[in-house]
Amino acid sequence: MRLDKLTTRFQEALADAQSLALGNDNPYIEPLHLLLAMLRQPDGATKNLLARAGVNAKGLEIALDNAIKRLPQVQGGEQVQVGRDLGSLLQATEKEGIKRGDQFIASELFLLAVADDKGEAGRVAREHGLARRALEAAIDAVRGGQTVGSAEAESQREALKKYTIDLTEQARIGKLDPVIGRDDEIRRAIQILQRRTKNNPVLIGEPGVGKTAIVEGLAQRIINGEVPESLKNKRVLVLDMAGLLAGAKYRGEFEERLKAVLNDIAKEEGQTILFIDEIHTMVGAGKAEGAIDAGNMLKPALARGELHCIGATTLDEYRKYIEKDAALERRFQKVLVDEPSVEATIAILRGLQEKYELHHGVEITDPAIVAAAELSHRYITDRFLPDKAIDLIDEAAARIKMEIDSKPEAMDKLDRRLIQLKIEREAVKKETDEASQKRLELIEQEIERLQKEYADLEEIWKAEKGAAQGAAAVKEEIDRVKLEIARLQREGKLDKVAELQYGRLPELEGKLKAATAAEASGQRPPNKLLRTQVGAEEIAEVVSRATGIPVSKMMQGERDKLLRMEDRLHERVVGQDEAVRLVSDAIRRSRAGIADENKPYGSFLFLGPTGVGKTELCKALAGFLFDSEEHLIRIDMSEFMEKHSVSRLIGAPPGYVGYEEGGYLTEAVRRKPYSVVLLDEVEKAHPDVFNILLQVLDDGRLTDGQGRTVDFKNTVIVMTSNLGSQLIQQMASESPDVIKGAVWQEVKTHFRPEFLNRIDEVVVFHALDQGHIESIARIQLQRLAARLAHMDLTLEISDPAVAKLASAGYDPVFGARPLKRAIQQQIENPVARMILEGRFTPKDVVPVDYHDGHFTFDRVVR
């Protein structure tokens, strides 16, 4: 017989049989070897066929293995030949193929030959249930009336089972999430599916709006019988594109697989609906020189109505791939899936609530659901509902689940702190000086205190964890019973439904109530370690961590901090009372929730001479709001003096170099949406730059070069300018209102009215006087004292020395900047020299005084 007339799978089985014979030192390849090799093939087709014929495939595999071990062995034989028994069986197989009209000999025909075999292989197979009649029936069912016309024919069988996932089956066993709402879209899809031709809906919408969920909803309705008569008992299959492409090594192999899928669907005569998620991937899939792609292979079947297909893709990809192929586009009917409203999202989340509670073993409260929908809509602007709201619920529940399963955050922090202290203790033990011994004593005390605290917390945690897990187990059992009730209702077994619904279910609900009550009674709110509920506060925490925006309810400490905001800012900014008050009011309005949600927290134009605290106030504000100056986005507008430099702020347009990189301003705000944006020296920028700032100041949004909307609603925008600084110095003796009026006139000549009209406040910084400079000197000296404290040195400076520094560093034209230079020259330089000379050592006091026209530094030892 010719080996090239065997199917590819049969040839592979023969090669595996040869390897088996070599591995067992058998001189001949016997039917036992080939039968075992077929059973061990990775796709499991032979096993499935034998199982259909009522054969115990697992038992047969073990028996064949044992029989091979009993075959005669020859040591050193490098060549194996086809044995006489196998040769005669292969001839019998060929006859079976001719009888059936096959062009290639398939592996299942060898099983028919084995069924009639009088040798060892036939005996073992019959012992495990192999019968010719049952096997023939199984082969006919698998072949579906087809003959074997190509070498790849076997691999194309049962293509639907291999390359699709049955969505209706998943709905039947309760694997799919419930689909709430979307009735109009599902009804429209059903309407299109009932057409005579072009009965193929394509769901188009933004990522995350629920396109796939609509198809899942359709599958659930089919299972529940809530569809028109023509759709009842149909199957919804999801095409596995990755499975179709994976391992298609040779040209034409992918096309053969897809053709097999289409043929199988055609055989089902309209009882199958094929769902292709990300349908744009079909355009160009499998394309090679001289070959047609998957999209073109689908067109004839779609046009004839043989293929009921539902597609899903995003708006961008539909435009980019499907619309370009007009012939493919006309075969689909568009169903637009819009983003649901906040109210609709809340309804969707309530439907999913039970599934997520069950998965995470926690309780999700209704305030958490409302907060997830509202906060995601307001603060996560680059994604779409309901996906982003579901993500918040999922992550908040996962966080609480993680606390239950692993150590709570409080214990984890204690544990890490203990490890840190123990490492430090070992390091300090090696030192012998007095300071190190004192430090060792403190470390020992701290370790003892923390270990006691940790032991107390561990005891509470274990008790709470046991109670939480008890309730979760009962919830899982309730879910299983509900799924069983739904299945029995579909099958019409109402007696069993009644038994479960009125017997088992109330019993479990009673258990759950008891478990929840036990959990609640074990709660000691002040000491409670484990949270078992997801509330609005937990959702707010997730949003805050993701965006850096403080959306949680204000604690009393933060309320007090905001009420005393002016005092905190005045610790760094001296003399500019009006500026500090205006900025503080803007922040309080936004944090209290009464500011316009569609505008930035505040937009200010700071005007004044150099060195009076404009930039310092921005730094102080960033430090106050975020405890870090890193949230200050500072852009020097003198870099944007040319017209074309606007693109550097928002990113280059398509086709230009740097398109992928994004803009300075837009990228910085996308990464830190809650920040202070400082546009320094704004009057030096090109007038066209102000045009892009108009929509930021008015609507709190800006579109970057890639078409993405960047949200500025949680930023404070500050622009500084030196316009009118000469007027401020010349009119120093005039009242603030007169100065502001004069400066305002000059500002109006430089900036456009539509720009000035959108700014919340124009703040005029007045020139600093001698008293202000003295206060600033004390702030600067405190910073120097803090730096010296790191070296265990104490700085003590007398009032005459401060006064002299203030007078030396006072210049009405340059503001406070000369003061820094005065401190550097008069204090820092001499002290640095003395430290290097060894005149000051740790524990010393560095006294600074001024008399007889110069500064003195007389060492004092403590």
From Swiss-Prot:
Its main location: cytoplasm. GO terms for cellular component: cytoplasm. It is found in: Cytoplasm. Keywords: ATP-binding, Chaperone, Coiled coil, Cytoplasm, Nucleotide-binding, Repeat, Stress response. Residues 3-145 form the Clp R domain. Homohexamer. The oligomerization is ATP-dependent. PANTHER family: ATP-DEPENDENT CLP PROTEASE, HEAT SHOCK PROTEIN 104. This is Chaperone protein ClpB. It comes from Ralstonia nicotianae (strain ATCC BAA-1114 / GMI1000) (Ralstonia solanacearum).
